[in-house]
Amino acid sequence: MIVQPSAVAKGWPIATTLLPASCGPADPKPEPKPKQRRLCRKVFPLRARCGALAHCPIPGKNEIFTNVNHSHISIPSPRLLLVEDDPRLREDLDAHFRRRGFRVTVCGDGSHGLEAAGREAFDLVLLDIMLPGLDGLALLESLRREQATPVMLMSALGAEQDRISGFTRGADDYLPKPFSLAELDARTDALLRRVRLDRLPLAQRRDTRLVFDDQAQDVLHQGLPAGLTPSEYRLLATLREHAGEALSKPFLYRSVLHRSYTRLDRGLDVHVCNLRRKLAVVAVRHLQIQAVRGQGYLLVETEHP
């Protein structure tokens, strides 16, 4: 039995439980936390790899993704090229996008991804960086020599230099692993909205009083150019495309400024201020850019002449 001398001196009662001199009272062991699957290629158990350019079978039950509310897809049945070497992640992404109405072509390596991109026109490419053989960055460079299809990179390499390397080689977005399904959907929908906007002919963008000139990246009101910058033009075109709808700052940063939103970044607010001023100079009074507290901005069309 272990007895503390100070306890005896103070007359404290002594416990009678005998313990080995080498151990103290045993603390109850906490129950182990259940392991959670994350959308990262390194933690998925590998299955047999699919054949080249063959669609992986869609699992009967999606074990990774849960049901979420999706935003509206701006392009009917968009065509998606998915290049991912992890069979488990590839299958689940394939199943998820097919349920959303996408037409998906899946590839397990860069060489077959490049071959598929040369055979068919896609609305969006979802591309892993760490691929066997031809890696994702090399594939991206090859795609950019031939086409301007939006490309979103996926990678566990989330360092700043890795992201910069992806953007400088032509990526439109960069999604670090692990990622949430909600963020994946938000980013893909934002890219598809840009695709739809870019494909609209000039005639469909005409306002009875305001004309959008895609080539000059400017608007004209009563024959007078507003003198917009490319970012201001994209901002006004995006707001006009979603007139009456409050667009969040994260969405506008991705769609217009092509970067992620941070709370201390006031770049979008500056562009909105300049855009309001330039529209006022050319007497555009029927369009108002309103701030929505806690959300972002929306464009309101009034009956003002």
Swiss-Prot record:
**What are the DNA-binding region positions?**
200-301
- Give the PANTHER family listed for this entry: REGULATOR OF RPOS, TRANSCRIPTIONAL REGULATORY PROTEIN CPXR
What is the predominant subcellular site recorded for this chain? cytoplasm
Which protein, by its recorded name, is this?
Transcriptional activator protein PfeR
Task: Quote the function comment for this protein.
Answer: Member of the two-component regulatory system PfeR/PfeS. Activates expression of the ferric enterobactin receptor.
Q: Name one Pfam family in it.
A: Response_reg
GO BP: phosphorelay signal transduction system; regulation of DNA-templated transcription
GO cellular component, alphabetical, reads: cytosol; protein-DNA complex
Taxonomic lineage is: Bacteria, Pseudomonadati, Pseudomonadota, Gammaproteobacteria, Pseudomonadales
Domain Response regulatory, first and last residues per copy: 79-192
UniProt lists the gene as: pfeR
Compartments annotated for it: namely: Cytoplasm
The organism encoding this protein is Pseudomonas aeruginosa (strain ATCC 15692 / DSM 22644 / CIP 104116 / JCM 14847 / LMG 12228 / 1C / PRS 101 / PAO1)
Residues recorded with modification 4-aspartylphosphate? 128
Post-translational modification here is noted as: Phosphorylated by PfeS.
Which PROSITE patterns does UniProt cross-reference here?
Answer: OMPR_PHOB (PS51755), RESPONSE_REGULATORY (PS50110)
InterPro entries, sorted = CheY-like_superfamily, OmpR/PhoB-type_DNA-bd, Sig_transdc_resp-reg_C-effctor, Sig_transdc_resp-reg_receiver, WalR-like, WH-like_DNA-bd_sf
